[in-house]
Amino acid sequence: MSEPFPIRFDLVTFDTPSTEVLAAFWSEVMGLTESEREDGDRWIVLSDNQGIRRLGFQRGTHRPGGTHLDLVCSLDQFDAERVRLLALQATETRPVRRESYGMIANFVDLDGNAFDLCAYR
């Protein structure tokens, strides 16, 4: 039997000049609560009540790039979740598309980080 892989995934971290603003946005999007905070607002971590889903926000230079998050919901929740994201001030970057696998909407958050809302068949 082999040893477990020594590296494990911990959290996704956003570099942002506005940790509290971006953490509040993602808290509403994902239903996560603040679980860690260091040096005022330099470092904030959100997590679910089991500590499994975690997002980090560290004060730093904002560098949106080619990486994005895929958020998944059911097809019957897709329209309502899309409206909720827009109400939270996410910006839709392309029209909603129907694909072979289901529906997709492309967004950026308040700092310009890309994420998709997907609903699979």
Q: Which role fits each region the language model picked out?
A:
Residues 19, 74, 97-100:
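Short beta->alpha junction loops/turns
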Residues 20-23, 76-81:
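Short, conserved charged micro-motifs
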Residues 9, 64-69:
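Eukaryotic phosphotyrosine signaling hubs
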Residues 13-15, 70-74:
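Short hydrophobic/aromatic beta-strand micro-patches
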Residues 22, 26-27, 85, 112:
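Conserved active-site tyrosine of GNAT-family acetyltransferases
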